[in-house]
């Protein structure tokens, strides 16, 4: 009888410990850090990785990774980012683009992401891409682009097309970034669609 009683107590103790351990199964789960999801940002040790990061920032809807694609004057004060908009965008948003800088880039991107349809993603597609110039400290990248923006703003377009010319420069520490950006309309692409410059202007107002 004593043996049976001891076994009963032992089994009860094991059962009680199992219940205590099981309580952790129902504990609130720590939310996953959003920065750990998506394609992420690769150290831009070459000009082509800058382009890869630019596309990934769109796919991930990640404004900070987008900004990391540009030159940083905190690292190299001689590399002030410059943006030249397409002709129609400059006519429409002349005062805005007169003093365009990295802060404007961030604000426009954040505004765009905040107005996306729920659970949707931006898409940047590049075509006819090439490096026109490749030097030890700079490169010039030319490409046509199309951008898909599934926005909830009915007054804004959802598709943009054009051509861009990017000067990608070494910013220090073996890293590269976009120092100059010239946007333009591509006459060979659907002229009814607006350029990237228009997109930036729309989401800055």
Where does each model-flagged region fall?
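Sec-exported extracytoplasmic/periplasmic mature domains
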Residues: 59, 71-75, 110-118
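Short beta-strand edge/turn micro-motifs at domain boundaries
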Residues: 24-37, 138-140, 146-205
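Extracytoplasmic/secreted proteins, especially bacterial periplasmic and envelope-associated proteins
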Residues: 46-49, 53, 65, 100, ...
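Surface-exposed, charged secondary-structure patches
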Residues: 88-157
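Short, low-complexity N-terminal intrinsically disordered segments enriched in polar/charged residues
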Residues: 23-60, 68
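A solvent-exposed, charged loop/short amphipathic helix patch at secondary-structure junctions
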Residues: 30-37, 82-93
């Amino acid at each position: 009888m004593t043996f049976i009683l001891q076994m009963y107590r032992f089994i009860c103790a094991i059962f009680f410990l199992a219940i205590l351990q099981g309580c952790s199964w129902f504990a609130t789960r720590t939310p996953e850090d959003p920065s750990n999801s998506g394609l992420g940002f690769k150290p831009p040790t070459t000009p082509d990785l800058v382009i890869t990061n630019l596309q990934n920032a769109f796919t991930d809807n990640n404004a900070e990774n987008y900004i990391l694609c540009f030159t940083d004057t905190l690292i190299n004060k001689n590399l002030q980012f410059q943006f030249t908009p397409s002709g129609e965008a400059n006519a429409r948003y002349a005062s805005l683009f007169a003093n365009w800088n990295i802060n404007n880039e961030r604000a426009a991107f954040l505004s765009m992401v905040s107005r996306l349809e729920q659970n949707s993603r931006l898409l940047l597609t590049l075509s006819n891409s090439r490096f026109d110039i490749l030097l030890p400290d700079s490169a010039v990248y030319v490409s046509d682009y199309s951008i898909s923006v599934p926005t909830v703003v009915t007054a804004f377009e959802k598709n943009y097309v054009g051509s861009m010319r990017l000067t990608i420069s070494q910013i220090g520490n073996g890293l590269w970034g976009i120092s100059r950006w010239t946007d333009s309309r591509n006459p060979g692409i659907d002229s009814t669609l607006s350029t990237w410059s228009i997109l930036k202007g729309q989401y800055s107002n």
